[in-house]
Swiss-Prot record:
The lineage of its organism: Bacteria, Pseudomonadati, Pseudomonadota, Betaproteobacteria, Burkholderiales. It comes from Paraburkholderia xenovorans (strain LB400). This is Endoribonuclease YbeY. Binds 1 zinc ion. It is an enzyme of class 3 (hydrolase). SUPFAM superfamilies: Metalloproteases ('zincins'), catalytic domain.
Length: 153
């Protein structure tokens, strides 16, 4: 029987004043549970919920893309033997807009993006179709176990 990975979580919500309803949907225990469900090894992660300006600045600085995106993952582990370490940055207004456009509950979209970002922190990617299909299948399975619907339907 495999053990549950340990998670050290630093939760930051500088966008709380502008997005209090988002913070209310994201209690520490829920965020930690969603991340732990997607962790395959011990992890030390910072999750930061930001506004559009900070999201855009980070995306422009680190990816060369001048717009806010839903989730950015910065993975720091240097080898597979290291604990999973990284920062997940979620942009509240982008997540809210996408959830509305996709007709899904905001909390379900946050859970999906936290699982998605956690997989990125472990080296999963979706740049080529085969990798995207694998990553989407893992996300769908994890979210199903957490009681959320398939995010790709």
């Amino acid at each position: 029987m495999s053990r549950t990975p340990k998670l050290t979580l630093n939760l930051q919500f500088p966008a709380a004043k502008a997005w209090p309803e988002h913070k209310a949907l994201l209690p520490r225990a829920a965020v930690a549970g969603w991340i732990k469900a997607a962790l395959f090894a011990d992890g030390e992660l910072t999750v930061r919920f930001v506004d559009a300006e900070e999201g855009r600045t980070l995306n422009r600085t680190y990816r060369g893309k001048d717009y806010s995106t839903n989730v950015l993952t910065f993975a720091y582990a240097e080898s597979e033997d290291d604990p999973v370490t990284g920062d997940l940055i979620l942009c509240c207004p982008v997540v809210e807009k996408e959830a509305a456009e996709q007709g899904k509950p905001l909390v379900a979209h946050y859970a999906h993006l936290l699982v998605h970002g956690t997989l990125h922190a472990q080296g999963y990617d979706h740049e080529v179709e085969e990798e995207a299909e694998e990553m989407e299948a893992i996300e769908t399975e994890i979210l199903g176990k957490l009681g959320f619907p398939d995010p790709y339907q």
